Swiss-Prot record:
Record motif YPITP motif, residues: 253-257
This protein's name: 2-oxoacid:ferredoxin oxidoreductase subunit alpha
Major subcellular site: cytoplasm
Residues engaged in binding substrate: T256, R344
Amino acid sequence: MRLSWVIGGAQGTGIDTAANIFGNAVASAGYYIYGNREYYSNIKGGHSYFSLTISDKRVRSNTQKIDILVSFDAETVFQHFYDVKDILIYNKAVETTKIDAVQSMEPELAERIKDFLTKQGYETTVKGALEYASKNNVTLIPVNYDEIAKKVADEMKVPLSVTERVKNIVGITISYKLLGLDVNYLIEAINSTFKQDLYRKMNELAVKDSYDIVESRYNLKPSSKERRRFWLDGNTAVAIGKIYGGVRFQSYYPITPASDESVYIEAHQDVLMEDPITGDKKKGTIVVVQAEDELAAINMAIGAALTGVRAATATSGPGFSLMVEGLGWAGMNEVPVVITYYIRGGPSTGLPTRTAQSDLIFPIFAGHGEFPKIVLASGDHAEAFKDAIWALNLAEKYQTPVIHLVEKTLANSYSTIPYEELELDKLKAERGKIVESGDISYKRFKFTEDGISPRAFLGKATMYYTGDEHNEEGHISEDVVNRTMMYEKRMKKLEVADKEIPEESRVKIYGDLNSRNLIITWGSPTGVLRDILEESNFDFTLLQIRMFSPFPKNLVSKLMEGRDKIITVEGNYLAQTSLLVKMYTGKDVTNSILKWNGRPFLRDELEEALIKVIKDGEKRVVLNGGIYTSME
């Protein structure tokens, strides 16, 4: 069973909260869920929607087509009616609204929809869109949201303005009744979200007053399997990973989609802190600093790392661009700092609230000069949690910056994660070569066989840090022999990491290893491809790259042997993964499936693309799934 549910309305009206309540309630009934939220880069007024896929099996992707659409305004109907295939719940009050009256809709999109409705012989109104949907066998459910909100206000004896947002509860209640699940799961989800008795009572009344509007359509039954699962998004997964992994300093400058991670850490600051020397634990607080800009954020994190605490920062494309100078300083001074890089659409401000995979080559080679950095890329929420810990361990073990890549899709999507996938029993801190103190002979940058020097913390020994080239003590030096040796010392750490980190841990492989087709991907497209691999008849080996620096060149090269087609699937124009594969292995990728319109890969569009590539032999397929790009 697989069911697609979408809720949409004006930004700032509680769409995200309503979707999370609904998702929580469905997950509590034992179902797996994958959800993604899309929103405009303004605070209020633009169209916001949340897509959920519900399944009795593990699910990792959404589709273009929608089984149930819950809409509260005219724009949601216009934006999504074409993709609804079963049920459309709409606000009866907006039936006569003309598309030209929807001021928040982008004019290009409005023109496409008007043109489509006109050619199909319908009015360019909500009514016309609904008639088109009805003709295509969609069941329409009109709802008088204002009437129910007024009824609740009268029962609670509060102003109507207070009950305005119960309309969202009405929409998800009708949806829940259509699924046929026990309403008590929904009540529990509401009460776990709202803590004030007024709002709990108000929303419970909204459930009671709207539950009987429809009859059950899908008759889902609660799962009998008792399993511990988490329901969380990517930002939260990374934040929890950092907390669990022992981060003690987090700096940031607000930027979408990175800020939510730091906000979560700030709200959960009280932790047990472990002394890096003695191992003793005591209660403490994570320091979270909202800096004045990204330059300050990276330099604060570097300073904190020098004192011996696990330190990190989080940012996105424009912010990372500002951090590059600080990143180079950290590379020169072998500072174990972690940067969580949330990738969004660029260049410049670009698409602040939309996804991309265009920042892949950039972080690997960011900074002038050459210095080692480790670059990780998470593919799902469990990996995001574990990689946050892995990044902290790698940074301290190899005394080098670590960049953790998380796309906006992963950051702002939600999923149910089985408890065992987090592998908590396997997670531990690795702090590398730490010395308690140093005497007058201590050399912070001492030449060693593996390039990694014993690390003392500020205040524990005499040491010098500078952006200039330096000798073993840290004093500035332009001596040619020292320059060669110190340069090699730094770069050797990446070579050592390449030898010590098993290549098998830097990739994941799914499917039949003997398939004639190899798909190489990274990040969130992995989940879409895994769903296709498990539930469709496509024949391919799926290779997910989890670490780009050091690159797992030997394993990737071996997996490329004897294939008819080697295909990259990624969210950028240049097929950057194929460029890296060529650079590190000397072998060519034969085909690419690409997308850069700011929206995530959707399962149905990717299945169509695979047919074009695997069966028809197309070399390059560009996807454009989103709103009304599939209109004929």
